[in-house]
């Protein structure tokens, strides 16, 4: 008896999610993204069992994505998810001969990096804004300093707990639940101390058992969306570049490379599983070097 397509979708997506969590060690956010992509594939290509999956079903899916004029990066992400899904089906002996996935060629965009001067200006903004309440100014200054000093992802920042912070380093839990120690600069440590007492103490009175480092004014763990929104607003005061919390991670890595830091050390601090993810910053640093050369070489003046 053939299983109804909706029941098949639900069952196979649950099994796939378990595979991503246990075998691949992915976080819930990544698993949700994979589920969404595969759910789209199953629906668009009218898949009601593994036997329905063929090269043609992949073409149907890809054509629909092209018809929707999805961005190249989105298209590539969906096809990568499809490739992982097929590997899962093969591993479960549900699809012995998976279709071939051809990835579209993508121009890998280099991140637009803040200069050290722009970072310094950004770090100073919260305390300079007259209408910014002092408790928010000190909290947000500590957030900005921590992001730039350590290069952590905004999700990792929000997950930091009081016990994860010492005088000269922080303990970070990154992708795949992997833990790493990252040095904490003295200016960042000073900014955190200035926030902890009295401002964080005031927040915690509303929620005494909360032990996350960065709290909302109601005493709860700070949400990533809040960090993104506040940094975006601060950045508008000092630069026309698009700035997000990840911009400070880019700046952290690029400025370290500019100052001759070892690429492998940067890889460890960023929590990259592959060195290729870190190598993108060598291209950013090289572009910066070329710009300086063109600006200062006598033949170009």
Curated annotation (Swiss-Prot):
Intracellular or extracellular location(s): Cytoplasm
Source domain of life: Bacteria
Domain annotation Tyr recombinase: ranges: 109-294
Gene Ontology molecular-function annotations: DNA binding; tyrosine-based site-specific recombinase activity
Alphabetical list of InterPro entries matching this protein: CB (IPR044068), DNA_brk_join_enz (IPR011010), Integrase-like_cat_sf (IPR013762), Integrase_catalytic (IPR002104), Integrase_recombinase_N (IPR010998), Integrase_SAM-like_N (IPR004107), Recomb_XerD (IPR011932), Tyrosine_recombinase_XerC/XerD (IPR023009)
Swiss-Prot/TrEMBL GO biological process terms: cell division; chromosome segregation; DNA transposition
Annotated Core-binding (CB) domain residues: 7-90
Assigned keywords, A-Z: Cell cycle, Cell division, Chromosome partition, Cytoplasm, DNA integration, DNA recombination, DNA-binding
GO cellular component, one term: cytoplasm
Major localization class: cytoplasm
Catalytic residues (positions): 153, 175, 246, 249, 272, 281 (o-(3'-phospho-dna)-tyrosine intermediate)
Pfam families from the UniProt entry: Phage_int_SAM_1 (PF02899), Phage_integrase (PF00589)
NCBIfam families with a match to the protein in the record: PRK00283.1 (NF001399)
Its job: Site-specific tyrosine recombinase, which acts by catalyzing the cutting and rejoining of the recombining DNA molecules. The XerC-XerD complex is essential to convert dimers of the bacterial chromosome into monomers to permit their segregation at cell division. It also contributes to the segregational stability of plasmids.
Family: Belongs to the 'phage' integrase family. XerD subfamily.
Quaternary structure (record): Forms a cyclic heterotetrameric complex composed of two molecules of XerC and two molecules of XerD.
Name of this chain's protein: Tyrosine recombinase XerD
Organism of derivation: Chlamydia pneumoniae (Chlamydophila pneumoniae)
Upper classification of the organism: Bacteria, Pseudomonadati, Chlamydiota, Chlamydiia, Chlamydiales
Recorded name of the encoding gene: xerD
């Amino acid at each position: 008896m053939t299983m109804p397509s909706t029941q098949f979708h639900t069952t196979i997506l649950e099994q796939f999610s378990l595979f991503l969590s246990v075998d691949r060690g992915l976080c819930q956010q990544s698993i949700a993204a994979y589920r969404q992509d595969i759910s789209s594939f199953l629906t668009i290509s009218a898949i009601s069992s593994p036997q329905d999956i063929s090269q043609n079903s992949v073409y149907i899916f890809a054509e629909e994505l092209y018809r929707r004029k999805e961005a190249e990066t989105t298209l590539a992400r969906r096809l990568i998810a499809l490739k992982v899904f097929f590997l899962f089906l093969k591993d479960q002996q549900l699809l012995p001969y998976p279709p071939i996935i051809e990835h579209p060629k993508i121009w890998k965009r280099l991140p637009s990096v803040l200069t050290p001067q722009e970072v310094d200006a950004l770090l100073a903004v919260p305390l300079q804004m007259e209408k910014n309440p002092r408790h928010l100014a000190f909290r947000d200054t500590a957030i900005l300093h921590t992001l730039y000093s350590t290069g952590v992802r905004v999700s990792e920042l929000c997950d930091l707990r009081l016990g994860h912070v010492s005088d000269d380093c922080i303990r970070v839990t990154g992708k795949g639940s992997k833990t790493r120690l990252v040095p904490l600069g003295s200016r960042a440590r000073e900014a955190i101390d200035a926030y902890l007492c009295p401002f964080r103490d005031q927040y915690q009175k509303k929620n005494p058992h909360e032990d996350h480092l960065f709290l909302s004014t109601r005493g709860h763990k700070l949400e990533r969306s809040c960090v993104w929104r506040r940094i975006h607003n601060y950045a508008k005061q000092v630069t026309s570049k698009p700035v997000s919390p990840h911009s400070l991670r880019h700046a952290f890595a690029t400025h370290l490379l500019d100052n001759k830091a070892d690429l492998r050390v940067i890889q460890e601090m960023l929590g990259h599983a592959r060195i290729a993810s870190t190598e993108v910053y060598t291209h950013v640093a090289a572009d910066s070097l070329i710009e300086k050369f063109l600006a200062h070489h006598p033949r170009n003046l």
